[in-house]
Amino acid sequence: MKQGIHPEYKEITATCSCGNVIKTRSTVGKNLNLDVCSNCHPFYTGKQRVVDTGGRVERFNKRFSIPSSK
């Protein structure tokens, strides 16, 4: 590898809005503030909610379906 052309690889901290602090290494060179992390994201915590579309699929099918010839 060529010397002097690669960015510095520094240790940084990524701080989540929930208070979780993650130490990692990066070429960014500054600490990061995160909105969500694996401690507070609904997918990882098991608190994921299913969004109900309120019958939109049925309403679409009713509106645009071709009447059956039975």
UniProtKB/Swiss-Prot annotation:
Pfam families: Ribosomal_L31. Binds 1 zinc ion per subunit. Its cofactor is Zn(2+). One of its GO terms (molecular function) is metal ion binding. Keywords: Metal-binding, Ribonucleoprotein, Ribosomal protein, RNA-binding, rRNA-binding, Zinc. GO terms for biological process: translation. Zn(2+) binds at C16, C18, C37, C40. One of its GO terms (cellular component) is ribonucleoprotein complex. PROSITE patterns: RIBOSOMAL_L31 (PS01143). Gene3D superfamilies: Ribosomal protein L31 (4.10.830.30). InterPro entries: Ribosomal_bL28/bL31-like_sf, Ribosomal_bL31, Ribosomal_bL31_A, Ribosomal_bL31_sf. HAMAP family: Ribosomal_bL31_1. Part of the 50S ribosomal subunit. Belongs to the bacterial ribosomal protein bL31 family. Type A subfamily. Binds the 23S rRNA. This is Large ribosomal subunit protein bL31. It comes from Histophilus somni (strain 2336) (Haemophilus somnus). The lineage of its organism: Bacteria, Pseudomonadati, Pseudomonadota, Gammaproteobacteria, Pasteurellales.
